[in-house]
Amino acid sequence: MRRIVYVSTAAVHGRGPFRGVRPGEAPVAPVSATSRSRAAAERHVLDAGGLVLRPHLVHGEGDRWVVPGLVGLLRELSATVSGCEALQSMIDVGTLGRAVVAAALSPRHGPGAHYVAHPDPVPASELLAAVCERVERPGAGAAVDVATAHARAAGSPRALHHLGMLTVDHWFADDGFWKDLDCSPGEGFAGTFARSAPWYRSYLATGE
């Protein structure tokens, strides 16, 4: 076996905020059981000389957490949320797949942990606007501020989790990763999300 590549998650660092954090700058401090298990798996891979990739938010076909969770939040609120400008590191699933293959085959990458995301972080307001425009628009009510949204979503832990995601920076910077792989990070959020929007609409309508 020439190389081990493990796709983990930036959630091994905990809840943030993280703004422009580079590899090695944030401690591994997982909060959830899932993140703790991934942090433990990372340790085994790194000890064996492997390569760990840490995406934050992965979107596109097959995503059953990020965008469906945001739609669930908007349904809970019957409105969108104003004042959400937190920056999120994002990557579409196709680009992530290319990055994994490139990392496995590249002769230039040694062991270690790297963030894998498009270099341009996405403001939460842009993410929300794209979901409302291309996937599902919430009820006709006016946008609500974060405090009101928190009160309305108080009975839904999942909705509160996604609301928290919109209000806390999770921006991880690792531009050298793409350069070292000689691999393009793709066109960015707007274009890739537009292509996956039909899949999201179908999934949310049918659950398949």
PLM regions with names:
Residues 5-9, 54-56, 117:
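Active-site beta-alpha turn of Rossmann-fold NAD(P)-dependent dehydrogenases/reductases
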Residues 18, 29-54:
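Active-site Tyr-X1-5-Lys
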Residues 99-161, 188, 194, 204-208:
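Mid/C-terminal beta-alpha module of Rossmann-like enzyme folds, strongest
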Residues 15-18, 62-64, 125-127:
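Short glycine-/acidic-enriched loop or helix-start segments at secondary-structure transitions
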Residues 64-69, 82-105, 111-115:
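Substrate-positioning beta->alpha
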Residues 48-52, 56-88:
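NAD(P)-dependent short-chain dehydrogenase/reductase
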Residues 1-33:
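Conserved Rossmann-fold NAD(P)-dependent oxidoreductase catalytic core, especially the SDR/UDP-sugar
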Residues 88-94, 122, 172, 187:
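Residue-level signal for the nucleotide or nucleotide-sugar donor/cofactor binding architecture
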